[in-house]
A protein has these predicted regions:
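Residue-level detector of Asp-centered blade-edge/turn motifs that repeat once per structural unit
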Residues: 4-8, 51-55, 102-106, 145-148, ...
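Sequence-structural signature of mature extracellular/luminal beta-sheet repeat domains
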Residues: 4-12, 17, 58, 65-68, ...
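Conserved beta-propeller blade signature
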Residues: 9-12, 57-61, 107-110, 150-153, ...
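Loop/turn residues immediately N-terminal
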Residues: 15-19, 63-67, 114-117, 157-160, ...
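Pyridoxal 5′-phosphate
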Residues: 29
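Residue-level "micro-hotspots" composed of small/polar
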Residues: 34-46, 75-77, 84-101, 119, ...
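Beta-propeller domains
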Residues: 54-55, 61-71, 95-122, 148
Length: 279
């Protein structure tokens, strides 16, 4: 990748060979590579993406070396690495970085192969959001923010609309018109007109986020079947506590001898019912 910072310095990722800074005046390169004897050297040679935040901090996403912060030093750039630590839940969730983004609230977000991470500038720690938090998948390829402050995140299993304040997620897949479930890292763009583009394995999708409407109504949930000791209960059956259909029953009273029971429930939403989530 090639990246130009706010000082018009041109950085070139050699991918396997570290990072190069192009000197426009001398038409030459300054090379930065991993050096185990130098704690201030770049921590990994496989650089995939770079990003400059509003504070002029430059962040480097690597393939296997985590997230790297680059700042000015007396004798050149000083590199600080942030890596995944399985013993520290506040560490970066993966050392494989796909995307780096600063939102409208000046929070730094990192898309990785194991979730979407929010970086805390004060504590130097990370908070990860994953599939269990509602994302379509843990592999996050791209991050774009809309005018409402929501993130549209491309993943390995569709696109997620993520509200970072209230932690609410809406997921979209091929049933909604996506080119495929899987998208491609580095292939996302917000145009000057506000149109979003996400590239995938079977083409690309483009849309204006304000035109993607969701249904805010929460469907009612009903108990549809009821079992006692693996026997399906119906009105009129011996030992059945039901006096009417289970969907019309407001209360069930059981003796202590009928203490092993189970039930089945469903939401009355038949439009893409597979998207129903129960919390």
């Amino acid at each position: 990748s090639i990246f130009e910072d706010s000082s018009r310095r041109l950085w070139v990722s050699a991918f396997y060979e570290g990072l190069d800074l192009y000197d426009r005046e001398s038409d030459s390169f300054i090379h930065y590579k991993r050096d185990v004897s130098n704690p201030n050297a770049i921590g990994h040679n496989r650089v995939f993406t770079m990003f400059e935040d509003s504070k002029k901090n430059i962040w480097i996403g690597t393939e296997g070396g985590g997230l790297i912060h680059m700042e000015k030093g007396k004798n050149g750039p000083v590199f600080t690495s942030y890596r995944y630590n399985p013993d520290d839940p506040s560490s970066l969730s993966s050392n494989l970085i796909n995307a780096i983004y600063e939102d409208s609230r000046n929070n730094l977000w990192i898309g990785t192969w194991a979730g979407l991470n929010r970086f805390d500038y004060q504590t130097k720690t990370f908070k990860a959001f994953r599939k269990e938090d509602g994302l379509a998948d843990n592999v996050v390829y791209g991050i774009i923010e809309d005018k409402e402050g929501n993130f549209w995140v491309s993943t390995n299993q569709g696109i997620s609309k993520f509200d970072p304040v209230n932690i609410k997620v809406e997921n979209y897949n091929t049933a909604d018109g996506l080119q495929a479930q899987e998208f491609i890292r580095g292939s996302f763009l917000k145009s000057k007109s506000g149109e979003f583009f996400f590239g995938g394995v079977n083409g690309f999708n483009s849309f204006f986020p304000q035109e993607i409407l969701s249904n805010p109504n929460v469907p009612p949930v009903y108990i549809t079947n009821f079992w006692i000791y693996n026997d399906l209960m119906k009105p009129g059956l011996p030992n059945s506590p039901l006096h009417s259909n289970i969907t019309e029953t407001e209360k069930i009273v059981l003796p202590y001898t009928q203490n092993e029971f189970s039930f089945e429930f469903a939401a009355l939403n038949y439009s893409q019912a597979f998207k129903n989530r129960y919390c």
